[in-house]
């Protein structure tokens, strides 16, 4: 006699196999979609030309003539793939070379003098300078870009034969850049201030000094942490620090943007660990996952979080990268496991079916 097994979709990897009785406990390169188990499709090569170093930022869009543009930032270079044109190097002149790997701060000068008592063993809380990452967005058909170890804002004016150049008058020593729905260019961690957000005049990317005749301005998020990321969601700018979340809303003259705390104890684990759908943002924190849909940040119950965070290479966590696969209602996080210094694993969340899956890429 055959007995039909009613196994719920998704993986359960928190705890023992005994505790997961009646659930799937392991998988690789499969997904659950509409309550059915399906294989994950393969990958397709976009170009046979390899980069000289590792890609750490990417943004795709269409220009005003409906030509596809894909901007890719690597540790030391900036490239564009243009419709009908091969890879073009648009690296700006004088850019600061970045880091391929997170670097330990345990050397001389890496910590505060006198922080611990003499003769007492130090706690195991080694700190790391994060890997270089890029933020890239389009301002109309042009692209604005910034690398974390360089900090300047560059603009590429939609010409594959021309390199990107420094955006005139923009602040330096930034953590990132984005373009708001109202068409302000906005810098995160502006001028080296870890909590400062600064924006240009509306529709005028080179006007940054506030005046009665323009809408340029700035604010500081009310956080005890440092800004790591920002993303546009539901008409707001969601700013994520390493401890909290903040929603910036456009209010017009005279302040232009106001802020509200959208969550505490929900800091993001890396600068690229957030992705957005049309209605919500999802990100990975230090030990859990979070969602923001325009109200307040809520933690996402995960059936695989113990597995993921226990095998994560903490020293290289700044390489974690999130993407949305809208076709299957999924948010994916790619991360390096404890046996690798580069990304070799993934965890994916189906935000419609509320299911999880994991796997490896190598």
Please name every model-derived segment:
Residues 52-61, 96-136, 169-182, 225-229, ...:
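Repeated scaffold domains used in trafficking and secretory/extracellular systems
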Residues 65-68, 130-132, 137-141, 149-150:
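Assembly/oligomerization scaffold segments
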Residues 86-89, 160-165, 206-213, 253-258, ...:
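Beta-strand initiation motifs
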Residues 88, 139-164:
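Hydrophobic or amphipathic alpha-helical targeting/insertion segments
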Residues 1-117, 155, 174-246, 333-349:
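N-terminal beta-propeller domains
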Residues 43-50, 119-124, 162-168, 214-220, ...:
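A short beta-strand motif characteristic of beta-propeller blades
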Residues 2-4, 223-362:
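Beta-sheet-dominated scaffold domains
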């Amino acid at each position: 006699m055959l007995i039909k097994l009613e196994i719920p979709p998704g993986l359960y990897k928190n705890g023992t196999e005994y505790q997961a009785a009646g659930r799937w406990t392991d998988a690789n390169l499969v997904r659950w979609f509409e309550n059915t188990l399906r294989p994950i499709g393969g990958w397709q090569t976009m170009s046979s030309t390899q980069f000289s170093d590792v890609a750490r930022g990417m943004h795709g869009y269409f220009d005003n003539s409906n030509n596809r543009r894909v901007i890719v930032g690597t540790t030391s270079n900036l490239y564009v793939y243009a419709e009908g044109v091969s890879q073009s190097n648009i690296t700006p002149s004088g850019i600061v070379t970045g880091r391929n790997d997170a670097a330990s701060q345990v050397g001389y000068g890496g910590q505060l003098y006198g922080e611990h008592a003499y003769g007492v063993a130090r706690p195991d809380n080694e700190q790391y300078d994060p890997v270089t990452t890029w933020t890239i967005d389009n301002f109309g058909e042009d692209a604005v870009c910034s690398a974390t170890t360089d900090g300047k804002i560059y603009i590429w004016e939609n010409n594959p034969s021309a390199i990107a150049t420094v955006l005139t008058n923009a602040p330096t020593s930034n953590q990132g850049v984005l373009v708001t729905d109202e068409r302000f260019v906005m810098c995160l961690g502006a001028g080296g201030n870890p909590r400062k957000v600064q924006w240009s005049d509306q529709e005028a990317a080179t006007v940054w000094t506030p005046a009665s005749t323009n809408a340029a301005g700035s604010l500081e998020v009310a956080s005890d942490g440092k800004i790591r990321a920002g993303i546009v969601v539901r008409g707001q700018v969601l700013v994520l620090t390493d401890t909290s979340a903040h929603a910036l809303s456009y209010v017009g003259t005279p302040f232009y943007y106001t802020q509200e705390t959208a969550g505490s104890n929900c800091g993001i684990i890396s600068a690229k660990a957030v992705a957005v759908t049309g209605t919500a943002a999802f990100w990975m924190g230090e030990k859990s996952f979070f969602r923001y849909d325009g109200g307040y940040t809520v933690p996402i119950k995960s059936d695989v979080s113990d597995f993921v965070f226990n095998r994560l290479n903490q020293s290289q966590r700044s390489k974690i990268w999130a993407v949305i696969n809208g076709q299957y209602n999924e948010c994916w996080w790619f991360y390096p496991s404890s046996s690798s210094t580069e990304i070799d694993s993934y965890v994916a969340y189906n935000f419609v079916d509320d299911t999880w899956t994991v796997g490896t890429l190598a």
